[in-house]
Each structure stands twice: as structure tokens, then as C-alpha cells.
Swiss-Prot record:
This is Large ribosomal subunit protein bL12. Acetylation of Met-1 converts MA1 to MA2. One of its GO terms (cellular component) is cytosolic large ribosomal subunit. Disulfide bonds: none annotated. Keywords: Acetylation, Ribonucleoprotein, Ribosomal protein. Pfam families: Ribosomal_L12, Ribosomal_L12_N. Belongs to the bacterial ribosomal protein bL12 family. HAMAP family: Ribosomal_bL12 (MF_00368). One of its GO terms (biological process) is translation. Forms part of the ribosomal stalk which helps the ribosome interact with GTP-bound translation factors. Is thus essential for accurate translation. The lineage of its organism: Bacteria, Bacillati, Actinomycetota, Actinomycetes, Micrococcales. GO terms for molecular function: mRNA binding; structural constituent of ribosome. Homodimer. Part of the ribosomal stalk of the 50S ribosomal subunit. Forms a multimeric L10(L12)X complex, where L10 forms an elongated spine to which 2 to 4 L12 dimers bind in a sequential fashion. Binds GTP-bound translation factors. The modification N-acetylmethionine is found at M1.
Length: 118
């Protein structure tokens, strides 16, 4: 099969068939058909982000365990920690390093909470 025959075969395909073809090519060759990201100001700003906010999205089923971890992380009293958990989504820590944010997220997810790092 030469290049022209391949192009003719592709022209005859439906949109669904083309979609399947693209997925098969991506899997076969380990590539992606996504448009490349243009390196610009936004990309540079994203790379430079050094401070992150840890937000408790929801407490999940193990609310008491989550309250204990929130107290440990924030240093809040029992009543204040319970209010934070009850009023989720709520920021727990702001302006922390990526490593610290990931550590906090792991502790909270370990006890069943949903956490976002922004």
C-alpha cells in the first residue's frame, strides 16, 4: 500500500471509524494526537508556582478520623477543627510548598477525606 492508497482509504472512513483509527494509532505507537501546548507566559507561570493551597473538599465517611487529622495539621482545637470539617469545602493550609501540600493531602485521603491542592 502506498501513501495515496492510505489517504484514499482514510477519506472513505466515517468519523467514528477515524476516531477508532486515531485511538489505535495512539496505543500502537505510544503517542497522543492532542495539540501541542504552546510555550508561553501561562506555561511559565504554572512552572513557577511554589505555593499551594490545601482544600478539604469533603470529609467522607470517617468524619472523626478526618477531624483528628485536621487538628494535627492545623493546630486547631476540637471545636474549630469540627467546624472546618462540617463546613467543607474549606481551605486548611494556604501558601505551603508542594511537598507539604502533597503530604497533607496523603494524610487526609488516608482517612477517607477528599482533598484538592490548588
Amino acid at each position: 500500500m502506498n501513501k495515496e492508497q492510505i489517504l484514499e482509504a482514510i477519506k472513505a472512513m466515517t468519523v467514528l471509524e477515524l476516531n477508532d483509527l486515531v485511538k489505535a494509532i495512539e496505543e500502537e505507537f505510544g503517542v497522543t494526537a492532542a495539540a501541542p501546548v504552546v510555550a508561553g507566559g501561562a506555561a511559565a507561570a504554572a512552572e513557577e508556582k511554589t505555593e499551594f493551597d490545601v482544600v478539604l473538599a469533603s470529609a467522607g465517611a470517617e468524619k472523626i478520623k478526618v477531624i483528628k487529622v485536621v487538628r494535627e495539621i492545623t493546630g486547631l482545637g476540637l471545636k474549630e477543627a469540627k467546624e472546618v470539617v462540617d463546613n467543607a469545602p474549606k481551605a486548611l493550609k494556604e501558601g505551603v510548598s508542594k511537598d507539604e501540600a502533597e503530604e497533607i493531602k496523603a494524610k487526609l485521603e488516608e482517612v477517607g477525606a477528599s482533598v484538592e491542592v490548588k
